[in-house]
Amino acid sequence: MSTPTKVALITGGDKGIGLETARQLGKLGIAVIIGARDSARGSAATAQLKGEGITAHFVQLDVTDQASVTAAAAKIGKDFGRLDILVNNAGVLDYGGEATPSTVPQDILRSTFDLNFFGLIAVTQAMLPLIRQSPAGRIVNLTS
């Protein structure tokens, strides 16, 4: 596979802000990789972007599963050899149904923190060797 000018991975890129970020990067001519834990939604988002003329690829990626993160980094390394842009977008806000911020059960707080914080760290650490292969690698962290 020939390597495009720039390659970007967007975690949680299958919907919402992640999908729109992928779309806007794709419109700039950047090859986008949709990272999503749900294969069906990730594949559908990738097909949608391809239908818009964007160079898009899908990689299964659950940021809370180290094996998934490692496999995604290996696939991106094999297919592209580098990563120019990492957008850490995957995240969740879960108050546990009717709970308020001051009454959220601790197990929900732990799973939220695992995804929103430790997931970001895991992906960043796994992708750093690929980002270092870029002449001007970038990491963007966002929450919503």
What are these regions (language model features)?
Residues 28-44:
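Conserved glycine-rich Rossmann-like NAD(P)H-binding loop of the short-chain dehydrogenase/reductase
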Residues 39-40, 59-74, 120:
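The beta1-alpha1 cofactor-binding region of Rossmann-like NAD(H)/NADP(H)-dependent oxidoreductases
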Residues 71-74, 78, 97-114:
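Active-site Tyr-X3-Lys motif and surrounding loop/helix of classical short-chain dehydrogenase/reductase
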Residues 124-125:
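A short, exposed helix-loop element centered on a Lys and neighboring polar residues
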Residues 5-6, 82-83, 131-144:
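Active-site loop of short-chain dehydrogenase/reductase
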